[in-house]
């Protein structure tokens, strides 16, 4: 039986307490994972300075070069996983086995993670706004003719990770280039990615002490967030909400991302159907940057009908099928609860499931696995309960609003793709505090430039600027 250990400052540690993670289809145990209790985590985190000192001994440019090598190791090399060795193909197969994600989608996410490591110089240039990276090495210097000084806010970054999509791991990778050690809590059914990323970086020369890896329970997660000076927390609105006022944490919750078609281009909606489809369906519809809403001023029902017809082509396929676009649910009860929530919303007047006539039932069993088939709902008002919802499958509400209600009616949105030439609407979106990432023009919500901030700027999360003067 494959066993994944805890990593205590890079050193493998097997615990008596283990979690047994099943294969998504057979439900037989696929991997055992050592579990760290809160006491062990708190004890280990009493000394964070030594790991930080080891990273700080390298220049930023040296760490960027290491990450470039690690990108290749992550994609192609055979790396340790517990007492065994894992090829890149093993990683794809194992991740798919515990999460249900099709192999093709795992490989796309692999490329995303590798790409961020390989292009770390560009990523840091974007996050630091072109800061001379030697300033991070010295702690001070001159930027655009002004004296500047930056200091780390923390000795480590604690990260509570999800299981829904491996691509999220690209968000914490830059911490190593910024000389901040990582304390990682993997998702319950996706322990593979953070472990493999760490091993790739260690092989590339990053000190192993920069990586602590603690599979743990709710109490252990709390110990990580409480004892690391800075944190990153992935979860839905209900789990991240209680930390909303904790400035030490960068929260990654429900996205409520949207495609908005301005009134000026509403009659041309068919030109943008591909953008809407890609925004809703890529990565199995499981990302916070997937569009969960299409907001229009006219032609709402026509747009919803066209989307429903296109998405009906997405059906369950074998996980090794290169055309597989839909991920099953590792836990069938989760799929049942989600489908029940959608049905409850549909019982309220003003919403219609336009996918039903194409696909039949939403909740289906196929070859021993449970799926939710793509669902497009036409909603007559932005006040309807389904107007602003997000679920872990390709789901979107097509919402009709009056032109004057945009963008105020949108509510908080991680990504907004605004298809419009209306400068007044563009200006409102640009100045809106509720839009985190803004695309002007027909850009899928899933298309991300990783040198741009994502739900906060990681450099500003990990470093602060101080006033600085030095005598001549």
Whereabouts are the PLM-identified features?
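Short, aromatic/basic amphipathic alpha-helical patches
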Residues: 197-199, 243-245, 306-307, 428-433
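Rossmann-like NAD(P) dinucleotide-binding subdomain of oxidoreductase/dehydrogenase enzymes
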Residues: 129-277, 453, 459
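Conserved C-terminal structural/oligomerization subdomain of aldehyde/semialdehyde dehydrogenase
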Residues: 23-36, 60-75, 186, 203-208, ...
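Glycine- and acidic
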Residues: 51, 178-186, 290-292, 410-414
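ALDH superfamily catalytic-core signature
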Residues: 76, 203, 228-230, 236-381
